């Protein structure tokens, strides 16, 4: 398999999932502004949507949306417990989380990274994200992970959103539960491995809040 990614982008989520699952995959770095792969290829030829992540399977089939990709990864190694079994209520709750993170968090964050987004609109988006964080923090009270005691692909996705906060001026100190959760996820060996591989942290960096 090949995972097409950009450092620190939402593709960090499936990158973490791959490492946690123990599955082997080749990483292909993408410059999402130039739409070029690290080898100089036209990324649009790989993914006409132009964004990451993209998972290319060994048979040439391709998946291009994060929630689909991470569930595919989880299902390839059920022993990893990265996703509950298909058809169970627990799986539907996982999908509920993935959909929430996609629609209510990820899509609110994206314009915050765009220089052309008006400052007033950015503040509106931050307020919306804050309200969503209020709710997520309530759900996490008394739990280590979104689904309880087990780390799942939903946690990898939420963690990715949380590390974005420092880049857009959102202070997690307002949500101690989320701040502690972020540190807890960041301390996982495979999460650190993914972040080191993407150049987000260095080998000897301490777990940062």
Where are these regions (language model features)?
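Terminal-tail/helix-coil boundary detector
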Residues: 196-209
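Generic structural signal for helix capping and beta-alpha/helix-loop junctions
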Residues: 35-37, 182, 202-203
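Helix N-cap/coil-helix junction residues
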Residues: 23, 170-172, 200
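GST-like domain detector, emphasizing the conserved glutathione-binding G-site
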Residues: 1-127, 137
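Short, solvent-exposed turn/loop segments enriched in Gly/Ser/Thr/Pro and often Arg
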Residues: 31, 153, 198-199
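Short secondary-structure transition/capping segments
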Residues: 38-42, 186, 205-207
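GST-like fold's C-terminal all-alpha helical module
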Residues: 89, 97-190, 194, 209
């Amino acid at each position: 398999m090949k995972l097409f990614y950009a450092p620190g982008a939402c593709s960090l989520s499936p990158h973490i999932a791959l490492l946690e699952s123990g599955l082997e995959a080749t990483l292909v770095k993408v410059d999402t502004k130039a739409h070029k792969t690290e080898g100089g290829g036209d990324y649009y030829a790989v993914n006409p949507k132009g964004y990451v992540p993209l998972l290319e399977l060994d048979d040439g089939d391709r998946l291009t949306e994060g929630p689909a990709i991470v569930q595919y990864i989880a299902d390839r190694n059920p022993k990893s417990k990265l996703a509950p079994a298909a058809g169970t209520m627990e799986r539907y709750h996982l999908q509920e989380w993935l959909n929430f993170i996609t629609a209510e968090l990820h899509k609110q964050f994206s314009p915050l990274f765009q220089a052309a987004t008006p400052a007033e609109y950015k503040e509106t988006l931050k307020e919306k994200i804050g309200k969503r964080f209020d709710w997520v923090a309530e759900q996490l009270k008394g739990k280590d992970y979104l689904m309880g005691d087990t780390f799942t692909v939903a946690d990898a996705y939420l963690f990715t959103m949380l590390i974005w906060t420092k880049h857009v001026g959102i202070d997690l100190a307002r949500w101690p539960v989320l701040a502690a959760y972020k540190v807890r996820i960041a301390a996982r060996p495979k999460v650190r491995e993914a972040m080191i591989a993407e150049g987000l942290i260095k080998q000897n960096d301490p777990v940062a809040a």
